Swiss-Prot record:
The lineage of its organism: Bacteria, Pseudomonadati, Pseudomonadota, Alphaproteobacteria, Rickettsiales. PROSITE patterns: FTSZ_1, FTSZ_2. It is found in: Cytoplasm. Gene3D superfamilies: Tubulin/FtsZ, C-terminal domain (3.30.1330.20), Tubulin/FtsZ, GTPase domain (3.40.50.1440). It comes from Rickettsia prowazekii (strain Madrid E). This is Cell division protein FtsZ.
């Protein structure tokens, strides 16, 4: 009797991280990461432009929408980009299978990235993959149409990703100077993605005292909405604090403050000379910035012999909410007929509803925009004055005079009608309803209303 006994094959159990570049911008980002020899991640690029795809350094390439675009690109149409991705859904699904985490990088505002990225994100989510979007927004000089296209693409993409990081290209001017080349500027934006991926992979593959597993990372990044990534390196005195400061103040990101973040992933990497106190100082500085006692903060520390004398701090903050109240959309106070005092500090005031001002048939007071310069002018001298006498509605008990909103409406109308009024002083008076000196209120002719 012969027994055939085979030793079990060595199975490497480790999370698979995929960086998926979409369109021209996404492909360029992947090329830069390959140039930088990033370890611990697989790379895939997908494009509708066959020529651009051919020049990619990535081995795994997907030609999107062969029948839809014939390799000629999406023509800046997100609809075409989406159709191309849907046509190539099987290839996309195959490239993502067995991945535990995927970073989808693209440029918003064009055709392929804007249209295809949400489709790829949806497929990743259907496969149960932790999905992170890292995308750019156009420069201002690229025009309003491209910016609107980008915003629509972001809304679509955010439905399918666990975490979304937005890098406005316009923010490159914060760190660039007159000598910065165009290529170097885009590499700065790509470095945000590079640093974020490296921060995650280092925690799992680099040796260290405090290593994290993939479940820790998933706990911080799953279903967390908007996020920011940052990294900082420093040497010399106070290197840990300085590196942490650089990591938490990334000038390129759309949401550059991690205050109030619900999840935080911290990776502090250094050489064998890194001390306990330095790790403590860096971690505490980030915790202070987050300022949320309920935040899920996951910390790891690894060693890298190449960083002798240097400390690198990487941070991923997730669950960063957008502004709760849109700017310049303030309601008028029902009790005083006036705007909140802080309104006057804004450059533009947009009123969407006015409930307590009397209605006039000849003019609608809805959706009025008033420039601050037409409201906050100082009027002096004896030039012609505009006097508006308006019955007080819901008059305050103390009878104190309030700046009437109707006066601001009238001033806006005078300006928009190109009437030449040398504005020196606007006097807005409140007249007691019992004052019956005149049967007609002293207001502009087209607003006149006889007393009942």
């Amino acid at each position: 009797m012969v027994l055939n006994i085979k030793a079990p094959e060595n199975i490497v159990l480790k999370p698979t991280i995929t960086v998926f570049g979409v369109g021209g911008a996404g492909s360029n980002a992947v090329n830069n990461m390959i140039h930088a020899n990033l370890q611990g991640a697989n790379f895939v690029v997908a494009n509708t432009d066959a020529q651009s795809l051919e020049h990619s350094l990535c081995i795994n390439k997907i030609q999107l929408g062969v029948s839809t675009t014939r390799g000629l690109g999406a023509g800046a149409s997100p609809e075409v980009g989406a159709l191309a991705a849907q046509e190539s859904e099987n290839e996309i699904r195959s490239s993502l299978e067995n991945s535990n985490m995927v970073f989808i990088t693209a440029g918003m505002g064009g055709g392929t990235g804007t249209g295809s990225a949400p489709i790829i994100a949806r497929i990743a989510k259907e496969l149960g993959i932790l999905t992170v979007g890292v995308v750019t927004k156009p420069f201002h000089f690229e025009g309003g149409h491209r910016m609107k296209t980008a915003d629509k693409g972001l809304i679509e993409l955010q439905q399918f990703v666990d975490t979304l990081i937005v890098i406005p290209n316009q923010n490159l001017f914060r760190i660039a100077n007159e000598q910065t080349t165009f290529a170097d500027a885009f590499k700065m934006a790509d470095d945000v993605l590079h640093a974020g991926v490296r921060g995650v992979t280092d925690l799992m593959i680099m040796p260290g005292l405090i290593n994290l597993d993939f479940a820790d990372i998933k706990a911080v990044m799953s279903e967390m909405g908007k996020a920011m990534m940052g990294t900082g390196e420093d040497s010399g005195e106070d290197r840990a604090i300085k590196a942490a400061e650089s990591a938490i103040s990334n000038p390129l990101l759309d949401h550059s403050s991690m205050c109030g973040a619900r999840g935080v992933l911290i990776n502090i990497t250094g050489g064998p000379d890194m001390t306990l106190f330095e790790v403590d100082n860096a971690a505490n500085r980030i915790r202070e910035e987050v300022d949320n006692i309920d935040a899920n903060i996951i910390f790891g520390s690894t060693f890298n012999p190449e960083l002798k004398g240097i400390i690198r701090v990487s941070v991923v903050a997730t669950g960063i909410d957008a502004d709760k109240v849109p700017k310049y959309k303030l309601a008028i106070d029902k009790n005083t007929n006036t705007l909140p005092e802080e309104t006057y500090n804004e450059s533009i005031i947009q009123h969407t509803q006015i409930e307590t001002i009397p209605s006039f048939n000849s003019y609608s007071t809805e959706n009025i925009e008033i420039n601050e310069s037409s409201i906050k002018q100082d009027y002096t001298g004896n030039e012609q004055e505009l006097r508006l006498h308006v019955n007080a509605v819901n008059k305050p008990e103390n009878n104190s005079q309030k700046s009437s909103f109707l006066g601001k409406i009238w001033e806006s109308l005078r300006t928009s009608n190109n009437q030449t009024l040398e504005r020196k002083n606007v006097i807005v008076n409140t007249v007691d309803q019992d004052n019956k000196e005149s049967d007609i209120h002293d207001i502009p002719a087209f607003l006149r209303k006889k007393r009942d």
